[in-house]
Amino acid sequence: MKEKSKNAGRTRREKENSEFYELAKLLPLPSAITSQSDKASIIRLTTSYLKMRIVFPEGLGESWGHVSRTTSLENVGRELGSHLLQTLDGFIFVVAPDGKILYISETASVHLGLSQEELTGNSIYEYIHPADHDEMTAVLTAHQPYHSHFVHEYEMERSFFLRMKCVLAKANAGLTCGGYKVIHCSGYLKIRQYSLDMSPFDGCYQNVGLVAVGHSLPPSAVTEIKLHSNMFMFRASLDMKLIFLDSRVAELTGYEPQDLIEKTLYHHVHSCDTFHLRCAHHLLLVKGQVTTKYYRFLAKQGGWVWVQSYATIVHNSRSSRPHCIVSVNYVLTDTEYKGLQLSLDQAASTKPSFTYNSPSNPVTENRRVGKSRVSRTKTKTRLSPYSQYPGFPTDRSESDQDSPWGGSPLTDSASPQLLEQCEGIESSCVYRQFSDPRSLCYGLPLTEDHHTSNELYSHPHSESCERGCCKAGRYFLGTPQPGREAWWGAARSVLPLPKSSPENGDSFEGVSPHIASIHSLQVRGHWDEDSAVSSAPDGGSASDSGDRFRADQCRSSPQEPSKIETLIRATQQMIKEEESRLQLRKLPTDVPLEPTNSLAKSFHSTDFPQSAMQSVVCRGPAQVISPAPSPVPLSRLSSPLPDRLSKGKDFLQNELSSSQLPLTGTCAVSPTPALYSLHPRQYLEKHAAYSLTSYALEHLYEADTFRGYSLGCSGSSHYDMTTHLRKAEQAPGHKGTSVIITNGS
């Protein structure tokens, strides 16, 4: 009996083993694996295989008993399937809703060191980091669709990162942390409607499983990856502030590495993609490696390029603490939407190539050492009050900071800022408050050197010229009065010279303002220091009242009466009294006014309507005639002490006298721009009506001086605006010619 029972048990086990071996042979696995599998493994693999048929009911076609109705293209895909798995830098896996691994490709052993047989049929939770269990559960959770009765089967995309157990040696494992390796998984959750029409399954859906591909992120030696032409690398701190960038970033995005260093990556990413980048950044800090979604990196010239980044946290070799982030970035497209500005950096890069700040000149800096301490005092840069115009530069020039008077209240708080492009034929000036700069009249182009060049450009006046009234003048002084009084008071647009000139070796402080009123022919050759610049009785400048300006900024506002308006009214009254005396003399009326200073005759007329003046902005090759033709405001002129007047005196004797022409004819003027000066500090001659001090004109000049001046005015009765052109002493950043518009008497 015992022998029979032993034989029966042995036979039963042999049959059982034989059935298991037969079952193992049916598994779609290599015989080398199935022949060494135990019974439990065979049962586990078989169960997984059967569940896979639920996920893919059509299976492999004919091999599962179904008639093949596939096209030739699908057959080619099946034939290439095994080869695709070998070339895939990752592995494919299918996970059931309960977490069981239904299938995993044999390439998983290359990345994890775990065999296909070992992983299949076991729970995925056994091979992932405990901190990732909740995330995996959320991935496997399905949601009911909104219109379930219209959909029989649908898929939900999934993309996530798992820290999976890795048993490879350190030399082959890449970057691992505590025996876990970061795997980027992407795939879809398959949802299908129940095939049973009976209750309670009618209209319900079942979660079939997750089908995904796992990719190993770049190993720790990211810097050893060969960077192709469409790749660049950067190193950043843990808060994504860029520390180092590869030089290829300039070719791909337009930004030089130094433009991006010390700036956060979020600053240069499209605002719609910052959320995805933030999520990737969070995963990177938690798991150590991440692959970002496709995001738009803003290009310097506008628009963006599509980028995907593979980021890794590098740990300190000694302390094993996170040290920095190293990212390899793949630029996937060319620049899209070029010219579309989405950030301030892009806007700054497309602004005109001019700036208020002149580049420092070493020669000028060396010569500036011996100057007074006051002239070298730097003041804090003031911000422009016109913040609603971000497209224009708001910084002030360096010479303005050097001025001992600082800036005047009107220039700092109310005057329109002038933009000047000092290079190129199309140099022009634009006011900020001019909504349409095209309405301005562009006349009288100036050549680079008017003494040698005869090339002038004609300008036909049109209706736009009539609309070009001087808004700046009306803003400061109100509506100008018609007639000669307006010409007398308003035709004094004075331009200061540049700050320094490397050629003559004189700095700005040693050059007196080249400002004068051209008198008649009888007194043309006589110049003295007082005729060039008005001086106060104490030897200082008549306009040396910067402290008083700063104390009366609010009162000097053009919105309420100020010293400017008071002095203008007094000056206009004085001019009217002088004209009453001038009317006693007969005016010659038969000789027209000839063009002066080598200007084309086409720009002059024989009469001028007694009406409100118009603003004429002249566009020339390298110079602008405007209310303030230089970005250097008039307040930067130094105090005209006697030792600073030699330069201006020589200039006035030699050049102004040589270019002045005798004027005869009727009360005719050329339509040269008669503009209000943008800056109130004008250093005029005897009739300086715009001197913004607390003195009246009687305080600045004696009675005999005014009497002599009145007699000189009675000698001739015509008015003239003589445009004197002079080659400017060019300083770095201020190129072009200097223009002085004066009126002679």
Curated annotation (Swiss-Prot):
The UniProt record lists the keyword Membrane: no
An annotated GO cellular component: nucleus
Biased composition (Polar residues): 350-364
Record domain PAS: where: 77-147, 218-288
Biased composition regions of type Basic residues, renumbered to the chain: 369-381
Gene Ontology molecular functions: DNA-binding transcription factor activity, RNA polymerase II-specific; protein dimerization activity; RNA polymerase II transcription regulatory region sequence-specific DNA binding
Tissue-level expression: Expressed in embryonic forebrain at the eleven somite stage. Detected in brain throughout embryonic development.
Matches recorded under PANTHER family: HYPOXIA-INDUCIBLE FACTOR 1 ALPHA, SINGLE-MINDED HOMOLOG 1
Name of protein: Single-minded homolog 1-A
